Amino acid sequence: VTAPDRTIWWDAPATTAAALAVLRLTDGDVDAGRVAAHVDPAGQIINQRLDRDPVDAYTTATVPAEVAAAHVTVVVNLYRAKDQPAASIDGMMLGAVPPSYVDPLAGARALIDPHRTRRGIG
């Protein structure tokens, strides 16, 4: 069984620009670098979900539009989760604010799943 593809198929500057547009930020904003830092991790999260064989790796020219759109969504989700508190024992105490969990693939699964290949089966 081969490991899922980890190829970098995305265009980082284009993905960053699209995510900044969704967030209504510009290249000059303080958080622009933070948004850009989420591009590669978001792509690898999508690679894991796609579970593609490395032989079927996408290139920047062959990536489906839905997968590229999902990539922007995951980048935005990761950016929006930046200020969330980590889960802690305090979340279990009476009167404490419970920790929340942001699913980075929320809103992106419907775009990604039609392009999955092995579906976790070796």
Specify the residue positions occupied by each region the protein language model found:
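Divalent metal-cofactor coordination and adjacent catalytic microenvironments
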Residues: 1-122
